[in-house]
């Protein structure tokens, strides 16, 4: 049985465990700096069952279009992880029309549906194979079942997400930028904060990066924020031991929640 997954090394991420947990092994193409078409194609063997593509590094390494071309040339499916990359909303159509064999997106994050749901679309035959992991079959997906009410919640959230016009989306992104700059003004002179800045490589990707003084552990602070009621969750899985900063992502916040974050940080650092 073919069980080899090809992944560009520059596309590495914590979620590749989803492949190895079901018995696949990953072969990395290229290096941490990038990957060429020849390197990606040269990694393919008789055991290759799919080529994985991480959309969060779409601008790095071999492009999605080139990856799909390679996959088709060798008869190997290309699976795109577009989990939190559905903004702008036109991205959903872009991936659907890209020719990728399967595309997976998160039902939470930017769509704001139930966090333990997702959407898988692509080739009908592969979708049918994925459904074999669902009830009434007791396969590897049995422990990851999604309740019917969550499915309805995801469908409603998706409809609301797609009902937004391009003009409304621009207004939404402008609001994120305004709120992000407000956060910076509130935090930049706070004791324990060495720097606070807005980063927005795209209008729909607005972040505030808060860097703390060396005497403060960002990781410890992150875990303390989780213990609050309501909990403020800071992802730490990709945080290095010496990484002394946290990011605030506005595409995952409701209006006004940034004020709760600022107040929590002010209380903890005072």
Identify the function of each model-found stretch:
Residues 5, 269-270:
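An exposure/low-complexity boundary signal
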Residues 1-166, 173-174, 184-191, 212, ...:
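Conserved PLP-enzyme active-site core in the AAT-like
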Residues 177:
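Active-site glycine- and acidic-residue-rich loops that bind
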Residues 180:
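Flexible glycine/proline-rich
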Residues 188-268:
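Conserved C-terminal alpha-helix-loop-beta "cap" of PLP-dependent enzymes
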Residues 95, 164-169, 236-244:
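Intrinsically disordered, low-complexity coil segments
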